[in-house]
Amino acid sequence: MIKHALSVTRDGDFAQWYQTVISEADMAEDSGVRGCMVIRPWGYGIWERIQRLLDDRIKATGHENCYFPLFIPLSYFEKEAEHVDGFAKEMAVVTHHRLIQKDGRLVPDPEAKLEEPLVVRPTSETVIGAAMSRWVQSWRDLPVLINQWANVVRWEMRTRMFLRTAEFLWQEGHTAHATVEEAQEETRKMLEVYRDFAETCLAMPVVAGEKPENERFPGAVSTFSIEAMMQDGKALQAGTSHFLGTTFSSAQDIKFQNSEGQFELAQTTSWGVSTRMIGGLIMVHGDDDGLRVPPMVAPWQIVIVPMLRDQPEDAATIDYCKSLQAELAKLTALGEPVRALLDLKAVKAQTKRWGWVKKGAPIVIEVGGRDVAGGNVSVIQRNKLYREDGKLDSRIMPRGDFVAEAAAILESIQQGLYLDARERLDSNIRRDVTDFDGLAAMFADSVKFPGWAEVSWAKPTGAELDAVVERLKALKLTFRNVPGTAAPAEGTCLFTGKPAVERILVARAY
């Protein structure tokens, strides 16, 4: 019987398991502010890898990085009614610029009230739109293709680390174009960048498609998303791309003179992913021993743990490990130099080993005196942790053989994690549900892992759509997206009985 590293299992309590992984893997912790987390070095290291790999892809599509203020005048939001309605309940607002002492406490100085309240950035369409209105005068100034890595604040009431926090980190792209066609192409292109990034780098298979009307970003003409399946069967929206039309260019006066001398409003887009991707990574790849980090986003791909015994031969063991680390650093795997760490912390080797297992380091190497004498290493692969007899699978390999195979092992781990998650996604989307009673039975409380349903619908709008959404809420379900790869709709709409026009995903979601 396997004795796992975590006290809570996925089958026993998935929500508590998720929190336990974050804690035991030293990913993050609560701060003194409700809903704001401290991202610890291992968690932030994963975010840095996400930043680096995604930033390269964003720049490869012609975008440039920039930075805009954290504080946005309230009047900017008031110009776009639908947008402000969508975020009003989540906005943090600054009203004073100074504190004073009063009765032994610090309080806002009533004499220091701002002339206009400042909203702490929930998203940047408004402030970037104001800048674009200054930058764009002629069709020659288009397109504008910019991206920002920043923090945002949305005052969430029900928070969960990495998934829903009052403050989170993200990138947000914003573009302006001369035509609808160019802007729509940009929207689809960046959705594909996200899909490829999630699947290639995070080993996280996703379904890309368009959101229904009720799930659109406030102010958007159309919203597209990538949706990932977690190990409990719920969906996670891992990234979005929005075609905004002239909603924000009209509000912020982003207009240009076309080649015929006539003035037009620019067509704009926005798109973003956040630290929510790390929450998805945990729930897609984690197991009952902690996190499993795909090698492409692992801060350290190989961790070397010397087995020291306070003996004279310890010096030789450390030298052996240092030379091994240097050898590994010369290798290339998955398109980059191998990232190898020698852990020399004054902690017992067994404690270090299990610490790195819980963190999800792809490969842990243990080196003791016998290994040095025999020219060997002991190899633990995080995706193949146990033997068939339930014991830890620590393989002894000749050092030269391991160095020769290290890159291939890392690549196999990356591919293996993806294939496992891909099989879970593909085998748990049901396409045979044809009526609402069948949908209700599929998602009955007694069903532990319902997965997702892809169903035919008539694309209702307005009050008819609102009524459908309320019926889904009773089952704790939401529409996810209309998959771009879905088969043509057949028969009638599961919700209205009208002729179906497309297929849409329905699931419980984070």
From Swiss-Prot:
UniProt-recorded Gene Ontology molecular function terms: ATP binding; proline-tRNA ligase activity
Keywords, in A-Z order: Aminoacyl-tRNA synthetase, ATP-binding, Cytoplasm, Ligase, Nucleotide-binding, Protein biosynthesis
EC number: 6.1.1.15
InterPro entries attached to this UniProt entry: aa-tRNA-synt_IIb (IPR002314), aa-tRNA-synth_II (IPR006195), aa-tRNA-synth_II/BPL/LPL (IPR045864), Anticodon-bd (IPR004154), Anticodon-bd_dom_sf (IPR036621), Pro-tRNA-ligase_IIa_arc-type (IPR004499), Pro-tRNA_ligase_II_C (IPR016061), Pro-tRNA_synth_II (IPR017449)
Disulfide bonds: none
Catalytic activity: tRNA(Pro) + L-proline + ATP = L-prolyl-tRNA(Pro) + AMP + diphosphate
Cellular location(s): Cytoplasm
GO cellular component, one term: cytoplasm
GO biological process: prolyl-tRNA aminoacylation
Pfam families, sorted: HGTP_anticodon, tRNA-synt_2b
Listed transmembrane segments: none
Entry domain remark: Consists of three domains: the N-terminal catalytic domain, the anticodon-binding domain and the C-terminal extension.
Subunit structure: Homodimer.
Function: Catalyzes the attachment of proline to tRNA(Pro) in a two-step reaction: proline is first activated by ATP to form Pro-AMP and then transferred to the acceptor end of tRNA(Pro).
Family: Belongs to the class-II aminoacyl-tRNA synthetase family. ProS type 3 subfamily.
Name this polypeptide is given: Proline--tRNA ligase
Species annotation: Sphingomonas elodea
